[in-house]
Regions:
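Residue-level signature of beta-propeller blades and closely related beta-rich strand-turn architectures
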Residues: 30, 72, 120, 162, ...
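Short, conserved, GDST-rich strand-edge loop motifs in beta-rich repeat architectures
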Residues: 247-263
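Blade-level signature of beta-propeller repeat domains, shared across WD40, Kelch, NHL, RCC1
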Residues: 291-318
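Short loop/turn segments that connect beta-strands within beta-propeller blades
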Residues: 37-40, 79-82, 127-130, 171-174, ...
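Short coil/turn segments that connect the beta-strands within blades of beta-propeller domains
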Residues: 21-23, 63-64, 111-112, 153-154, ...
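Repeated scaffold domains used in trafficking and secretory/extracellular systems
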Residues: 11-17, 52-61, 95-106, 141-151, ...
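Beta-strand-rich domains and repeat architectures in extracellular enzymes and scaffolds
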Residues: 7-30
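A short beta-strand motif characteristic of beta-propeller blades
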Residues: 2-8, 43-49, 84-96, 131-139, ...
Length: 318
């Protein structure tokens, strides 16, 4: 029996953000929805609308603030009164008609900098005064990057699916410290990196390429886990050397009445650091292939996750 809570939002979504009190923020094309825990009912929600524009990216900021990137602006919003009302804190024009690649915008250095993913590299912005940002530098790269994870205060990992490489980048200078070749990424548009522990980072591979593990201290690839015809679109650390991945699994997992339906599912992994082994210990319920999917999130102080697929949001206990 499927134990997941399923919220049918009947519209495409792009990104989920966990809030305090286990409330859930959902980025749509031109609005943001805030659903209240524990029921996540669509009858009692906070809506933040952006008429006549499109939300190009979103990320959490400090103290219950969120940052929204539109075509031309950065907008900082504060959520108030237990996430039931909001106010616009700042609104600034940054780069006219600049869209983010894969809608990627992440916070760096404990919410003091922003990274904006561009078509040919990335931009770093400083918070020069509260909730006002200025350009620090642009880092150009011919093929651009797909996913990012900050591994130290001044060091970043990112990948380029076009080049089949993972890069370690020094953010101070900035420059590429080293790169690792032959890393095959099939769907680079979601969060394909995650920490496994303080020293190990995982990266989801393409339809046949499973999961890669990297030691961030030696900046080397240390493990390649493969499973026939299984690739991963999004990964998330869930603590204690455990992580989950959204697996594209063809017809291998889950159940469907339609023999032509291809399925996704959540796979659960544990990393054995002594033997450098990845062990799959659970496979979740299947769900139908969806063109639009989101990142995984884990709620603060609760043992449950959420994700979006095919116009539905799923909330699941771990």
């Amino acid at each position: 029996m499927d134990q997941r809570k399923i919220i049918n939002i009947q519209i495409y979504a792009y990104r989920l953000i966990p809030l305090d009190n286990s409330d859930l923020l959902i980025q749509l094309e031109a609005k943001i929805l805030c659903l209240k825990s524990p029921n996540y009912s669509l009858n009692n929600i906070l809506e933040i609308n952006f008429p006549n524009t499109m939300i190009d990216g979103i990320c959490a900021w400090k103290n219950n603030y969120i940052i929204i990137k539109t075509k031309q602006k950065l907008i900082v919003i504060e959520l108030l009164n237990n996430n039931t009302i909001y106010r616009i804190v700042s609104e600034q024009v940054i780069f006219e008609n600049m869209f983010l690649r894969y809608q990627k915008m992440i916070s760096l250095n404990n919410f003091s900098k922003l990274l904006l993913n561009t078509m040919n590299g990335f931009i770093i912005m400083n918070e020069k005064e509260p909730y006002i940002f200025q350009l620090q530098y642009s880092f150009n790269h011919d093929y651009g990057f797909n996913s990012f994870i900050q591994i130290r205060k001044d060091e970043l990992m990112c990948n380029s699916s076009e080049e089949s490489k993972v890069f370690f980048i020094d953010l101070k200078i900035p420059k590429i410290i080293t790169d690792i070749k032959d890393i095959n990424i099939y769907t680079p548009d979601i969060d394909t990196f995650c920490f496994v522990n303080n020293d190990i980072v995982a990266l989801g591979g393409d339809l046949r390429d499973g999961i890669y593990l990297f030691d961030i201290n030696s900046r080397t690839k240390i493990k390649h886990y493969k499973e026939d015809w299984v690739g991963f679109h999004s990964l998330l650390n869930i603590g204690n050397n455990k992580f989950i991945g959204e697996a594209y699994a063809g017809r291998c997992y889950g159940e469907s009445d339609d023999e032509n339906e291809e399925l996704f599912c959540t796979m659960f992994f544990e990393y054995d650091s002594q033997n450098n082994e990845i062990r799959k210990y659970k496979t979740g319920e299947g769900r139908i292939y969806a063109e639009r999917r989101s990142n995984y999130i884990k709620f603060k102080n609760e043992n449950k996750i959420a994700y979006y697929s095919n116009k539905k949001v799923y909330v699941e206990n771990l």
